[in-house]
Amino acid sequence: MDPRSEVVLRQQQYLAIKILLINPPADELAQQLAHKHQVSVWTWNFADHQYFQHQSIQSDFAVTFPDQIPDQVIIFVPKSKELLSYLLHVVVSHLPAGQHIFLVGEKKGGVERASKQLQSYGKTVKLDSARHCQLWQTTIETTEQLKPLEQWLKHYSVKNENIQLEIYALPGVFSQNHLDIGTAVLLPYLNQIKLGKIADFGCGAGVISAYLAQLSPHNEIHALDIDAFALRSTEFTFQRNGLASERLHLHAVTGIQDAPKALDVIVSNPPFHQGIHTDYSASEGLCKTAKQHLNTSGELWIVANRFLNYPLLIEQTFGQCQVKTDQQGFKILYAKAT
């Protein structure tokens, strides 16, 4: 069991009947709490959502607060400070004064910093500190009027050759405030890819998806991500740039295995973080199995950190892998299915 969950169980006497777990790890906590409490989950991680559904736990995969209002919430501190600000705002917009918010997280994950954000809404006390984790409790004194989701968007401009886009990103989405270096290195090469049915794996705020949609009206874009906030951000990016919604197909995925088949192109600046932890499994899985989702002569384009040995993984399934460029610490890798 995750150490954060163990800390929650140590202080179970503080919990009310109806509990909402926000951003919990995929472990046995919800099932154990369900013996004495009515437990539900709000998560934006599709893999975690599927796990809880399989465990018969009520789970909402969403960017907004669930319809059923709990007595209390337990927030597992996210990596993003902005995302925690959003979560706290949403919670105090739905729960009345006097109810409790619990905040749990790892010390290395910034729980002490997060507890200071919690103090804005009421008297805050530390209930426990164990397993390199802390559990905090606040009694809500200050409630807020719910702000529209759009007010949480940040945006920035992307320009390359004749393409100009405004990128819109919700809290917690990769590279929310500016274009990341890897994608910037990739953009000049996107006009070389085949037209057709294209998957953007790990779409984030939709930079690559929107760019490809702007390049040609013949491109059918499939935006794939594990994160509900990323998928919603991509949708906002298309809307705000006047790109036809019928050309965008959003897919919540746990990995490339959930991607559509018969694709002409898979393009990706693949994710390599799960919360505060580094995790290369999704990107390595992409290198190994992308070919199964491509048509004959279909293409794979990947941004990779220079130190990662992805060319070898790609060569094992495609037979070859070209390095289109190597700059600013990133390689653009290309392979063609045969």
Swiss-Prot record:
Gene3D superfamilies according to UniProt: Vaccinia Virus protein VP39
Coiled-coil segments on the chain, per record: none
Keywords: Cytoplasm, Methyltransferase, rRNA processing, S-adenosyl-L-methionine, Transferase
Function of the molecule: Specifically methylates the guanine in position 1207 of 16S rRNA in the 30S particle.
Predominant location category: cytoplasm
UniProt GO molecular function: 16S rRNA (guanine(1207)-N(2))-methyltransferase activity; nucleic acid binding
A GO cellular component entry from the record: cytoplasm
Catalytic activity: guanosine(1207) in 16S rRNA + S-adenosyl-L-methionine = N(2)-methylguanosine(1207) in 16S rRNA + S-adenosyl-L-homocysteine + H(+)
EC number(s) per entry: 2.1.1.172
Location of the protein in the cell: Cytoplasm
Family that this chain belongs to: Belongs to the methyltransferase superfamily. RsmC family.
Highest taxon above the source species: Bacteria
Organism (species): Acinetobacter baylyi (strain ATCC 33305 / BD413 / ADP1)
Record InterPro entries: DNA_methylase_N6_adenine_CS, Mtase_sm_N, rRNA_ssu_MeTfrase_C, RsmC/RlmG, SAM-dependent_MTases_sf, Small_mtfrase_dom
Name of the protein in question: Ribosomal RNA small subunit methyltransferase C
Assembly description: Monomer.
